[in-house]
Amino acid sequence: MKTWQELTITVHRDAEEAVSNMLIEAGSQGVAISDSADYLGQPDRFGEIFPDVTQDDMITITGYFPESFAITEVTASLEKQVATLKSTGLETGPVSIASHELEEEDWAENWKKYYEPARITHDLTIVPSWTDYDAKPEEKVIKLDPGMAFGTGTHPTTKMSLFALEQVLRGGETVIDVGTGSGVLSIASSLLGAKEIYAYDLDDVAVRVAQENIDLNANTENIHVAAGDLLKGVTIQADVIVANILADILIHLTDDAYRLVKDEGYLIMSGIISEKWPMVRASAEKAGFFLETHMIQGEWNACVFKKTDDMSGVIGG
């Protein structure tokens, strides 16, 4: 039986996305995340959100490498990369890295044991596609099989995006999902009553995975997935545009978003570390948007901007 090498990094949850990307770039065939916390603050409709997080802030991120990889060299390289994260504003905590061998049969299923049904917002629950789940009447269930290289929908940036969608969608809207990844935000938009959803991702693998996840969920024929580079070439007028991607990419999105968002429509952005938040806010406001909601979880920020002439609901400072 083929043997794989499992490399496990224990790190602060703020560094989850960065470390996961490091593992993939180093050659990992996927990542599994063990996170004891499943939290989302319960904020007011508008304004600042500061969730009360009392659980352990350390998580375990595991990568899976072929037997042929020089795991000692990979480990040394990752140690150096993780050590640089603090200079970017991310908390890493007391980092530890360990590795051991794993049989292929165990590797293929190992990541799934960390993925359990999770109530993300008041209405939305994410459930692994292989799990039987008895939903409560008020729950809207999103079925996902993201694969090891895609998020399971429980990262703070995704949670805040889902919360924002739950707040702004009232039914009948057109939504554009930029950088759809696993497709979770598009599926949520459909469940929350959006009429048409257009999901784009530059990565062909993400486009395929998103479509597979969409097909797992009933009544999602209104979701249209395609390869695309942000909003380039898009002409659809949307009530809501949502983008959970890196801050340095978001700032290149705001002008096109303003062009495509209808009057009184919304731009939801997430994936923003705190030190990048002023830059993203300035970009959106320069494009013509007004800040309506600002959400914070740890070092991560998300926001809802509105295209409006009515200043009564916006945040002034």
Curated annotation (Swiss-Prot):
Its EC number is 2.1.1.-. NCBIfam families: prmA. Keywords: Cytoplasm, Methyltransferase, S-adenosyl-L-methionine, Transferase. Methylates ribosomal protein L11. Its main location: cytoplasm. GO terms for molecular function: protein-lysine N-methyltransferase activity. It catalyses: L-lysyl-[protein] + 3 S-adenosyl-L-methionine = N(6),N(6),N(6)-trimethyl-L-lysyl-[protein] + 3 S-adenosyl-L-homocysteine + 3 H(+). It holds the Pfam family PrmA. The keyword S-adenosyl-L-methionine applies. It comes from the Bacteria. S-adenosyl-L-methionine binds at T158, G179, D201, N244. GO terms for cellular component: cytoplasm. It is found in: Cytoplasm. This is Ribosomal protein L11 methyltransferase. Belongs to the methyltransferase superfamily. PrmA family. GO terms for biological process: methylation. It is an enzyme of class 2 (transferase).
